[in-house]
Amino acid sequence: MRSGLRGGASHRHDALRYLFEIEKGYNGFVTITRKGKGKYRMEIVKIPDSGKTKFMELLLIADEQVSMIEKYLFRGDMFALCDADVKAICVVTQEQSGVYEIKNIITVPEYQRKGYGQRLISFIADYYKKPGNVLYVGTGDSPVILHFYEKCGFEKSHIVKNFFLDNYDHPMYENGQQLVDMIYLKRHL
C-alpha cells in the first residue's frame, strides 16, 4: 500500500459526498470492534460505474498508474467501506466462471492498521462465496503485504515474473524495494 494521498482530503470528501448522493444498489454492513470503543456497524456500498472515477485518487495509492487501473475499473465491482468517511475501497473482477480477483484494495492511509482492510476482504469473500469459487489477489514481494493477505486467509498460488517491469511505464517501489514479480495468492471461498 502506498503512502501519501494525491488530491488530499478534499478529493475524499467529494467521493464521500458522492456516496451519500447516489442511488445505492447493494449495501452491506460489517461490525467493527475497536479496543476501548466497543462495536459499531459500518456500511459497505457497491459503487455504480457512473461513480467509480470519483475514487481514482484513492485507487492510485495502491496502483499508481492510471492506464493499469483503467484496464479493470469498469469490468469489476467496486465496494467502499464507510461511516462518516471513506475508510477503504476495493475493486474485484471476475476472471472466469467462479474465479474472482481483487485488483485494487486500499485503506485510506490514516485509517490503516485498524482492521478496515481485513473486514472489507471478509465481506468480499462472503459476497462471492459459492462452492468451488476462488478469490485471487496479486501483489509485490513485500513481506508486510504478503503477511496481511495470509492473515486474511490467502495462500501463495503462483508468480508472474517481471510483471512490474513489463507492465508499468516507471519503476514501482514498495517500502523502498523495487517491485519486479507479481506474487499471486488465492483463497478458496
Which residues are covered by each model-predicted region?
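Conserved active-site alpha-helix within GNAT-family acetyltransferase domains
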Residues: 118, 141-172
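Conserved N-terminal entry element of GNAT/NAT acetyltransferase domains
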Residues: 20, 26-50, 183, 189
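Conserved beta-strand in the GNAT
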Residues: 80, 85-94, 98-106
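Short amphipathic alpha-helix that is part of the acyltransferase structural core
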Residues: 40-68
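Conserved GNAT acetyl-CoA-binding A-motif
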Residues: 128-140
